[in-house]
């Protein structure tokens, strides 16, 4: 239903056992830009690393240099018709934008009301990561671990690119499986997010503030508490952390500025400071 159709849409079927393969085959017959790639069923669902492994299974079979933009895109989304048209227009207007997205909402099961997933404006959302191809290559792609969808945006800023998302009618979409609603429940999903923050190198002070913020939004208290415990549990167990020390240092400095100045002011100031890096390498 998009006003701008893709040149190529690679769909990776990584082991569907329902009617998905037949549905995909029917769509591929109708739309010549759809390419279906089947991947062997792993026997279990692996959130985080598994998601990115599936993405690269398709990505590695495409010559991305032939395309200006690349998008990691989940199928459980209901997008407004002008979604990709608007994103491309924004990127054309500002060549420093490396990755962008709209905002995710989900429907309340009781009254059908749309509820925001509360993604910050300084991030593009994980379920629809729209990238300028040159930027995606510059950051080295996605890390194959939980929190890949946060690390990539920080890497963009480190290299002088801008990561951003907008909450506007043409860019608001419905996420049919909300953030943290893992196959094992909300608590497990939010704990996994807490581990992801730990892995990325987020400090305890920032994580605590972030968890308190999440406690004030659905699912009230439980979501934020689960995130905090997932982080602290990983810290106590001394689980492995992200090995890019320079990027972790960059992230920590930025997060402290967010606590001191507020996220909007801190992000604007950082993007201004990083402008020369982008000009030297990509202008």
Which ranges hold each PLM region?
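Conserved donor NDP-sugar-binding/catalytic core segment of glycosyltransferases
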Residues: 43, 78-115
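Short beta-strand-to-loop acidic/aromatic patch adjacent to the donor-nucleotide binding site
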Residues: 66-78
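Conserved nucleotide-sugar donor-binding
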Residues: 125-140
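Active-site nucleotide-sugar/metal-binding loop of Leloir-type enzymes
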Residues: 52-69
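Non-catalytic, C-terminal membrane-associated alpha-helical segments of glycosyltransferases
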Residues: 187-282
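Catalytic donor/gating beta->alpha subdomain of glycosyltransferases that bind UDP-sugars
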Residues: 142-210
């Amino acid at each position: 239903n998009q006003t701008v159709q893709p040149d190529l849409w690679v769909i990776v079927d990584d082991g569907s056992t329902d009617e998905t393969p037949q549905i995909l085959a029917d769509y591929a017959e109708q739309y010549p830009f759809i390419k279906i790639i089947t991947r062997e069923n792993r026997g279990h669902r692996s959130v985080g690393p598994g998601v990115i492994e599936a993405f690269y299974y398709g990505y590695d079979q495409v010559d991305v240099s032939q395309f200006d933009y690349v998008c990691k895109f989940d199928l459980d989304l209901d997008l407004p018709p002008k979604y990709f048209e608007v994103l491309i227009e924004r990127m054309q207007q500002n060549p420093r934008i490396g990755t962008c997205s709209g905002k995710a909402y989900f429907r309340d099961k009781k009254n059908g009301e749309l509820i925001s997933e509360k993604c910050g404006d300084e991030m593009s959302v994980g379920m629809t990561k729209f990238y300028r191809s040159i930027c995606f290559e510059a950051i080295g792609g996605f890390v194959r671990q939980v929190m890949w969808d946060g690390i990539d945006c920080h890497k963009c800023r480190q290299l002088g690119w801008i990561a951003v998302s907008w909450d506007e009618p043409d860019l608001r979409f419905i996420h049919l499986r909300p953030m943290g609603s893992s196959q094992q429940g909300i608590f497990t999903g939010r704990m996994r997010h807490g581990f992801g923050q730990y892995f990325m190198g987020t400090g305890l002070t920032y994580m605590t503030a972030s968890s308190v913020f999440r406690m004030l939004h659905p699912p009230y208290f439980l979501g934020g508490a689960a995130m905090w415990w997932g982080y602290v549990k990983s810290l106590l167990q001394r689980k492995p952390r992200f090995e890019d020390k320079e990027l972790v240092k960059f992230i920590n400095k930025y997060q402290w500025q967010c606590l001191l100045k507020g996220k909007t002011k801190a992000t604007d100031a950082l993007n201004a400071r990083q402008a020369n890096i982008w000009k030297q390498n990509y202008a």
